[in-house]
Structure formats: structure tokens, C-alpha cells
Amino acid sequence: MAELDTIYETKIKYTGLFSFNDLYNLLYDFLTDYNYFVTEEGYTEKVRAEGKEIEVKWLCLKKVTDYFRYRIKITMRLFRLLEVEITKEGKKVKMNKGDLEIKFTAILERDYENKFEISPFHKFLRAVYEKYIIKNRIEQMEDKLVEETLTFVNNTKAYLELEAKK
């Protein structure tokens, strides 16, 4: 079985005006621009008296080498989501108002093709390979994964800050 190491985890919280559709598309486009394959693992929507509750779960995979793969899990949770109409630059625009929470979990997946799972001896070889031969390479992969995840997080924050200023 592939080795999964959670490298980085963070959460963004935001309350105010934003466009959920724009945010959804922005994140999706950004991930695909970085060559991630995005799978929506879940989407639930509940209508409550105070507004909608939505939860979206994505699994984003990026093959880096034959041995390493980046895995980013994103969970978007929205509470008290209401559709409101605002006037922006003299035009009426539909926006969303509510609470938003986005969780990013970056995971480095090693031996995702299970090439070292053939026998106990191969598993031992993988341990030696990782500990002595590619130790620095693993650290580089971890750093690059954190860097990419932070890019997604910072761009999401920048979008939300822009929406707040409008």
C-alpha cells in the first residue's frame, strides 16, 4: 500500500459577501492549471431557516514522478448561505452572504503504484531506499507540495479579501 504522509494542513475562515460559484471555479481552475486532477468526492446541501449549508469535498491528485504523487484534500463548508443582491458599479449583482470555512490538507504519497508491495523483502528495500538513497528528494517533494498548497491558500485568501473590499 502506498505511504501517505500529511505534510501540511490549514484552514481559512471567512464571513461576509462572496460569490460561491466564482470561488468554486477559481479554485478548480487554479488546481487544474497546476496539473491536478480534481475529483469531487462529495457535495451535500441542506436548506435551513437561517440559510443553506453546503459541504464540498475534493480530492486533488498530481503525479510528480513514478514514485511520488501529491494529494491535496479540500473541504469547503458554508453556513447560513443566503443569496443577496448588491449594487456594484451601478449594476445589480447577485452574491452570496454567509460563513465559509475551507480546509486544505496536503499529503505526499510515496510508492503510489505499489511497486514495493510485492513481498516483505521489497518492503524492506523501500525502507532502505527512502531512508538512505532518496531522503533529500523526499524533503524536496514535501517542500514543493507545501509551496503549491500555500499558493492555493494565498490565492483563495486574496480572492476573499478582494470580495470584501467591493
Regions found by a protein language model. Name each.
Residues 1-39, 44-46, 140-141:
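Terminal, regulation- and interaction-focused segments at domain boundaries
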Residues 32-96, 104:
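Hydrophobic-cavity lipid-handling domains and compact docking modules
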Residues 103-166:
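Glycine-rich, aromatic-bearing surface loops/beta-hairpins
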Residues 7-11, 53, 99:
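Intrinsic-disorder/low-complexity, polar/charged segments enriched in Ser/Thr/Lys/Arg/Asp/Glu/Gln
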Residues 18, 22-25, 51-53, 147, ...:
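Short, well-structured alpha-helical interface segments that form or flank functional binding sites
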Residues 21, 25, 35, 96, ...:
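Detector for Asparagine
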Residues 13-19, 59-61, 77-79, 103-109, ...:
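Solvent-exposed residues in well-ordered beta-strands and their adjoining turns
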Residues 5, 9, 38, 56, ...:
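Generic, low-specificity signal for short hydrophobic/alpha-helical stretches with a mild N-terminal bias
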